[in-house]
Amino acid sequence: GFMGATYWMVPDESRTELYSTKLAYFQLVLWTVMGLVTVTGYLFRYGTGNKLLEQPLPSKIVIVIVMLMFLYNIAMTIKKSGRFTTTEGVLMGGLGLAALLYLPALLEFENYTVAIFYRWWTIHLWVEGVWEMIQGGFLAYLLIRLSGADREVMEKWLYVIVGLVFIAGIIGTAHHYYWVGVPSYWLPIGGLFSALEPLALIGMAIYAYSAIRRSGLAHPNKLALHWTVGSAVFTLFGAGLLGLAHTFPSVNKWTHGTL
C-alpha cells in the first residue's frame, strides 16, 4: 500500500514523472508472486516458525530486493527533478529505515529467547517507528494539498514526528521484553514511551482542521479531506488509546509477552 502511495506522491511533490514505470511494474509482479508462493508454502508448513516473521529465507531475500528496487526508483525520481522537500525527506527516511530494520529478520538463532529479542527490532520499530514516519509524510502531503495549510508549519510538525519516533518508538520497544533476560525496569519505561507516539500526528491534524475553519477554505473533495483527518483520529484511538491499554506491563505480558 505505501509503495503505491509513494509512487503517486513523490512524482507529484517533485513535479516530474516517475523515473522508471517498467521497474515499478516489475517490482509489483515480483512482490505479488513472492506473496502468493509464501502464503501457499504456509499451507504445507513451509516457514521459519518465528511469529510474525514466518517467511522462509528465499522470500525474505525477495522482500529485500523489492525494497531496494523501490528505493532506487524513488531516489532517482527525486534526483531527476532536482526538487527535494522536507515532506519527501521524512518519507524517504521512513522508507529507508523500513528496509534497514528488516535486516534483523534475516538472522537465525537457535535460542528462541534471543530470536524473540531481535524479532521486535523489526516488528516494533516498523509498526511503532518508521511506519509513523511514513504516515507523517503522507499526512503532511495530503493536508497541504487539501486544506491549504502552510507548508512551513506542516513540515515543522514533521520534525516533531521524527523526534517522537526516535525517542518514543525506540525506547518503547522495551514493552515487548518479557522473559528475555532484560532488567524489569525496562517494562514500565517501554509502556510509557509507547503511549507518546501518536501525539504529533494528532497535533498535525488538529492544526490543519483549525486552519480550514480560520480560512474558510472549502476544498471540493471533502471526502478526501475528511478521510485524511479521520486517519489521524483513528491513529489516536488505535495506536493511542487502544495501544496504551495494552502497553501496561500487567496487561502486555498476556498480549505481547507470550508471543
Regions found by a protein language model. Name each.
Residues 220, 249-257:
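Anaerobic metallocofactor- and corrinoid-dependent redox/one-carbon enzyme cores
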Residues 49-59, 85-86, 114-125, 182-194, ...:
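Non-cytosolic membrane-interface motifs at loop->transmembrane helix junctions
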Residues 11-14, 80, 179, 214-217:
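Short, flexible helix-adjacent loops and helix caps
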Residues 1-13, 21-45, 57-76, 89-108, ...:
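Hydrophobic cores of alpha-helical transmembrane segments in multi-pass integral membrane proteins
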Residues 78-84, 110, 210-216:
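Juxtamembrane/interface segments at transmembrane-helix termini
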Residues 83, 115-119, 124, 147-158, ...:
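Hydrophobic, small-residue-rich membrane helices and short re-entrant helix-turn-helix hairpins
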Residues 18-19, 151:
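Solvent-exposed interhelical
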